[in-house]
Amino acid sequence: MAHALIASPFLDGHLLLKPGARAGARISADHYEGLRQAATSGEPLPAWAMQTASDVWGLDLGGRTAQGTVVVREPSGYGHCRASWEINLGCNFGCKHCYLGERPFSGLGWEDKVRLLDIMRDAGVLWLQITGGEPTMDPHFRDAWQAGMMLTISTNGSLLWRPDLLRLFQDCPPYRLVVSMYGASEASFDTLTQRRGAWKAFRRGLKAAREAGLPLRINVVVTEDNASEAAEMAALADEWNVENHAYTNMTPTIYGGGEPLLAQSAAHLRQRKPFAGCNAGHTFFHADPHAKVSICKVGRDDQIDLMAEGIDGLTRLGTIADRLMLRTGGCEGCALSGTCRVCRPLAKHYQEAKAQLHSYCQHGDKENAS
């Protein structure tokens, strides 16, 4: 029987969650320990847990034992609560704006994938984003769900019609399915993705996912190829009653290539808010398809090979993060660093891509205005 709830440490507290649900409940340390004991010894689900499940999610868990009903995640001394994982690089689309550049289908074998997920669980990862490439081409993430992780799957949606995927997501409901939308017409969609039939596959997948009641969100990707359809894309998402967000500012490839920047719609670019810091490398990390771990998707210098070093390799991430965030290179000594709009790793990518200064640096604003 699939578990109905997850009880987990989270930063300086504890949470009670329902797989696939946006709402959650904070619980006391005593309640967490009580659930932990009940699950270990096969005791009935505590009354407070049954009441919380009823109040928050409308669940009737009367008469259930804690074991099998709740996944109680163990405390971790590593301090990580979120992670992202490129399960593979392969993709059935060839999007012009993709930050991965080349996309060969490569990644870990099944046993090493399970080992990586075990490391993530033991490191404390509760929220896991699985991306690619196209992750639904390689749907080996049931173990992550069974380990009590809240999964976000980032997908192009083209395969969501497949019965095996629909069953997987219904049996193991994700926290969210984030689907990228590349146009509101066949012409623009197929042009940006560089694949004939991509629009039809996207529509087929979205229709099946909506009918299955999956927790969808649409990222409306606005580029030069589909800029004239930006409003129409958002309107379609609204018509489908799917939460949506416009994505307009592209970043260079992870190898420092500027190709994605050429795909941007200049009329739709947004000025970023000042960068106020983040927890990359401290409470969050990113794993590539071969379990090479970095502080995030952007700052990939000094990767740690988890298959070679194991979980203790993560103890070096904080030091790496602090070093990568230093204002070095062309940013060293900048008097405007307090209001800089990008982190140092992202600025480095822009510099390597020889991007126009105003696209990432305040010093370029006057240059662009003139």
Task: Identify the residue ranges that each predicted region occupies.
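Flexible, acidic/Gly-rich N-terminal and inter-domain linker regions that tether
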Residues: M1-C81
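C-terminal accessory region of radical SAM enzymes
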Residues: R36, M250-K273, K292-Y350
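Short cysteine clusters
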Residues: C91, C95-C98, C278, C296, ...
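Iron-sulfur (Fe-S) cluster-binding segments and ferredoxin-like electron-carrier domains
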Residues: L100-L108, R300-D305, S337-A369
